[in-house]
Amino acid sequence: VTDEARARVGLTAVAPPGHRWLGPLVNELGAATVWAALLSGEPPPGRPPPSEQAVRSWRGWSERARRVDPDRLLDASAEAGVRFVAPGDPEWPGRLDELPVCYGLWVRGMGDLRNLCLRSVSVVGARSATSYGLHVAAEFSCELADRSFSVVSGGAYGVDGAAHRAALTTGSTVVVLACGLDTDYPRGHAGLFADVARTGVLVSEWPVGRTPRTPDFLVRNRLIAALTPGTVVVEAGARSGALNTASHATDLHRVLMAVPGPVTSPMSVGCHRLLREGRASCVTRADDVVELVVPLGEAAPEGAGPLVPAAELDRETARVLSAVTRRGVGTAVVASNSTGNLEHTIRALGMLAAAGLVERCEAGWRLPERRRPKRDAHRARSAPG
């Protein structure tokens, strides 16, 4: 682990994600320099806190930093099945570079976060969703998963849960939490999160041991918006947290979409406002979403085959794909012929399955019937729009 990564681990434990003063300081000087300054108690030379509140914040962060051992935190996380992904790591999603700052991500699950987010959509909405909202969330998410999209949401009751469950029926999903990944919140979704971890991932900016706090959910929402090229708001009341996610999507220049609902439903007031103000595009089916988030010429018709170009896979995942045959091969053999690491291979296979590049069979894994090796790397460019 590099000093820079170790410092970022520490920062997740002592400072709030995306802080408007500390964040730019980390971007400018590097996490290792800022972490060393926190341990010393003195701000970096020439970079004094800009206000009395910032001075108090610095003192609090400095006191907490002296009580944090990044290496022990990494060990405790590994015991809980949680890994740390820093900017620049192979699993780091490139879209997060557009955030003003993100110290790093804690990740749990067999999926590969970067690969899952290559072709993805965020689906959000009310916790107290109506039957209409639950139906639409499930229908959209299932159809998006059928078309090789990963569904990203916040793991809450209501629309989030419906979206995650539907995506799992044919693909993978990403859960973004506002607490440490050793905590299942809400508790009623512990089983759902276990299912997600088998093929997808759970993600958080907070380390293990951190319990959920109300302000953290709004901070978490910016990550949901940032991970994907587009966000769909299925249902949202006048003060719904989903509208906060929508604002982040707009700020990040992502595609914002909203589903219209009954004019008499208070759970659709927020969606109708987004549409009335021209902030969101109206979507009534998954095909509408695909047309808006996928560049012209890349939206292959349903059933045309894998929709993640092989050229966009990281090197390790590409090696795993090359070890899978048409007749089928066992997981251990794939690992032996590719990465040499069984855990990494299982994670890569889960991602490849979600992308439609491999499928399960009696022998283990095989290439789908429709796969055409010579065209994979060019499918996105040659598919009809």
Model-derived features: where do they sit?
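Short, small/acidic-rich helices and loops at N termini and domain boundaries
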Residues: 1-91, 274, 355-371, 375-385
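Glycine-biased, small-residue-rich flexible motifs in mid-sequence functional cores and linkers
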Residues: 2-5, 16, 86-385
